[in-house]
């Protein structure tokens, strides 16, 4: 079945069929043939004076091939798919995170990328955790440089006093193309660095570099941001956290955009093995560079987010799938459960939609069927670590997401929580209604958690579940969390607090068999809906996310929190 889409031709932004989009071609008006490479299409459009946005696709493809050849010459191996994707992001001027375990090619990419851009007159700074790594990278990059014929100056700060003195002179004068130092050098010798502007900064093991919040500011200065701009961004972050004045937030966002627009700025590539970045100033990267260090994905997003009121959710879901076709993901909230996912999948099958419920324990072969379009949709639970949310990487297949109910956290006044994350979320939600001791304990607990590993937190959680004591610091943390859990439980069972919660525009309450507090799960919504959009050589594909809202108050809370992240929810047709 041929479907036509308005405003999505990759060349003229006009009307185009799904068949031509699948083939990677522009519309028939621009290019009348049924096949052709990016280069062939480019030449035809150019010769016939029809070349528009396809020029960007062609230029990116050309640069990618050039980089692949350069990489092969330097390393004697072709770059793998992730390294090619990282290059495309850098070429397009995006700052971004690389979250991957060691041995995945981050450092090799950093060195070859530095040489590639250094040859084109750009200035690159590579920051690593230790001086030993500085030496290793310097030796490695010189091998690569010889292979590709790189003659520009590469400076690395390590070695004996004479070598360090020579390096400092070159750094002070800015007489280099590529600089490699430890993060300790960045902290101790910023006066030498501060007059340099860098087109690209690659921060290897950003977790250790950013332990000093001052290094965040230093990196931003070196990328071309002024102190005024950085402070304005910090004011905006604090205002967003307060969540008190949307209009003031919008105005400050516009002011910040204008400041950033006037300043020359480079890009930051932040590599991390864990993605465990915490702290307020880290959020400066989101406001100034458009991404979060250590986030699951960059904030670059090309998704239309739509909501409509839920009425007959099965019928509405069926009608949407019939209109949108294959490539759909259907999500139900965690409190609806697997049973609801199975129920919806069964209803869709009864109405000639090829659908299956997909969750942990289901055959992985269902993914192959979905990828091969033997299935139209998968139905699962909207849980942040759920299989359908995190375990699907099929950007060429997934086109849209339907949320049958708003993703949320549900807290019951009948039972105490045992999971640390949920205890702290509930405590944070109730902190405005608690005494000073509660607030102080909550703040202390958050600071303590920053100091412990994931494994240690797991030990504390198990001790809470099994009612066991620990030793030392971890026991103090366990006691704090239990205090917060018990006090939170008391608060949500007080009628005066319940009345105040009912007046809160961002918290939904359910009265039935006891009181339930509902809070929107923003992270899961962003992660799940993000399955519908992907980066490709010409840009980012457009996805569609549709929410069937089952709670007006919860919807408004989600809308507000998404707005703070720069994501707008749009009302859809109620038909």
UniProtKB/Swiss-Prot annotation:
InterPro entries: DEAD/DEAH_box_helicase_dom (IPR011545), Helicase_ATP-bd (IPR014001), P-loop_NTPase (IPR027417), Reverse_gyrase (IPR005736), Znf_Rg (IPR040569). Its main location: cytoplasm. Residues 316-465 form the Helicase C-terminal domain. Its EC number is 5.6.2.-. One of its GO terms (cellular component) is cytoplasm. It is found in: Cytoplasm. A zinc finger (RG N-terminal-type) spans 1-39. Residues 87-247 form the Helicase ATP-binding domain. It catalyses: ATP + H2O = ADP + phosphate + H(+). Keywords: ATP-binding, Cytoplasm, Isomerase, Metal-binding, Nucleotide-binding. ATP binds at residues 83, 100-107. Pfam families: DEAD, zf_Rg. A motif (DEAD box) lies at residues 204-207. It is an enzyme of class 5 (isomerase). Heterodimer of an RgyA and RgyB subunit. NCBIfam families: rgy. Belongs to the DEAD box helicase family. DDVD subfamily. Introduction of positive supercoils requires the cooperation of both the helicase-like and topoisomerase domains of the 2 subunits. The helicase-like domain probably does not directly unwind DNA, but more likely acts by driving ATP-dependent conformational changes within the whole enzyme. This enzyme is the only unique feature of hyperthermophilic bacteria/archaea known and seems to be essential for adaptation to life at high temperatures. It may play a role in stabilization of DNA at high temperatures. Modifies the topological state of DNA by introducing positive supercoils in an ATP-dependent process. Binds to single-stranded DNA, transiently cleaves and then rejoins the end, introducing a positive supercoil in the process. The scissile phosphodiester is attacked by the catalytic tyrosine of the enzyme, resulting in the formation of a DNA-(5'-phosphotyrosyl)-enzyme intermediate. Probably involved in rewinding DNA strands in regions of the chromosome that have opened up to allow replication, transcription, DNA repair or for DNA protection. This is Reverse gyrse subunit B. The gene is rgyB.
């Amino acid at each position: 079945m041929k479907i036509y889409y308005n405003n999505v031709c990759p060349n003229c932004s006009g009307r185009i069929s799904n068949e031509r989009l699948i083939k990677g071609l522009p519309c028939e008006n621009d290019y009348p043939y049924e096949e052709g490479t990016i280069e062939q299409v480019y030449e035809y459009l150019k010769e016939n004076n029809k070349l528009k946005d396809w020029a960007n696709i062609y230029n990116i493809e050309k640069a990618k091939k050039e980089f692949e050849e350069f990489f092969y010459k330097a390393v004697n191996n072709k770059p793998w798919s992730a390294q090619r994707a990282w290059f495309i992001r850098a070429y397009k001027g995006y700052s971004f995170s690389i979250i991957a375990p060691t041995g995945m090619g981050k450092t090799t990419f950093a060195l070859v990328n530095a040489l590639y851009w250094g040859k084109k007159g750009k200035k690159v700074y590579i920051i690593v955790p230790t001086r030993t790594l500085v030496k290793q990278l310097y030796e490695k990059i010189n091998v690569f440089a010889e292979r590709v014929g790189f003659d520009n100056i590469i400076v690395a700060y390590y070695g004996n006093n004479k070598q360090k003195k020579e390096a400092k002179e070159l750094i002070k004068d800015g007489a280099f193309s590529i600089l490699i130092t430890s993060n300790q050098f960045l902290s101790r010798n910023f006066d030498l660095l501060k007059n340099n502007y860098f087109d690209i900064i690659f921060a290897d093991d950003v977790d250790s570099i950013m332990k000093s919040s001052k290094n965040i500011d230093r990196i931003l200065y070196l990328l071309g941001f002024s102190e005024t701009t950085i402070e304005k961004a910090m004011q905006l972050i604090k205002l967003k956290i307060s969540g008190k004045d949307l209009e003031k937030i919008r105005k400050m966002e516009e002011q910040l955009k204008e400041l950033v627009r006037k300043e020359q700025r480079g890009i930051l590539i932040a590599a991390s093995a864990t993605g465990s970045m915490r702290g307020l100033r880290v959020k400066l990267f989101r406001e100034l560079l458009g991404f979060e260090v250590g986030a699951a994905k960059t904030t670059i997003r090309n998704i239309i987010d739509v909501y409509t009121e839920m009425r007959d959710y099965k019928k509405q879901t069926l009608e949407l799938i019939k209109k949108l076709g294959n490539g759909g993901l259907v999500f139900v909230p965690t409190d609806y459960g697997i049973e609801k996912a199975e129920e919806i999948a069964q209803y869709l099958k009864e109405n000639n939609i090829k659908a299956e419920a997909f969750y942990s324990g289901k055959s992985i072969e269902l993914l192959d069927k979905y990828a091969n379009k033997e299935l139209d949709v998968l139905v699962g639970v909207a849980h942040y670590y759920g299989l359908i949310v995190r375990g699907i990487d099929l950007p060429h297949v997934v086109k849209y997401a339907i949320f049958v109910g708003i993703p949320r956290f549900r807290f019951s006044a009948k039972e105490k929580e045992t999971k640390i994350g949920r205890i702290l979320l509930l405590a944070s939600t109730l902190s405005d209604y608690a005494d000073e001791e509660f607030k102080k304990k909550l703040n202390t607990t958050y600071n303590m958690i920053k100091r412990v590993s994931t494994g240690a937190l797991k030990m504390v959680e198990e001790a809470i579940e099994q009612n066991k004591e620990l030793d030392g610091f971890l026991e103090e943390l366990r006691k704090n969390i239990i205090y917060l859990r018990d006090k939170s439980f008391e608060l949500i069972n007080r009628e005066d607090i319940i009345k105040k919660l009912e007046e809160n525009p961002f918290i939904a309450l359910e009265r039935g068999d006891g009181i339930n507090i509902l809070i929107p799960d923003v992270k899961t919504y962003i992660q799940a809906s993000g399955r519908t959009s992907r980066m490709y050589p010409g840009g980012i594909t457009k996805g569609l996310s549709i929410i069937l809202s089952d709670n007006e108050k919860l919807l408004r809370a989600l809308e507000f929190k998404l707005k703070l992240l720069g994501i707008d929810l749009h009302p859809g047709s109620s038909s």
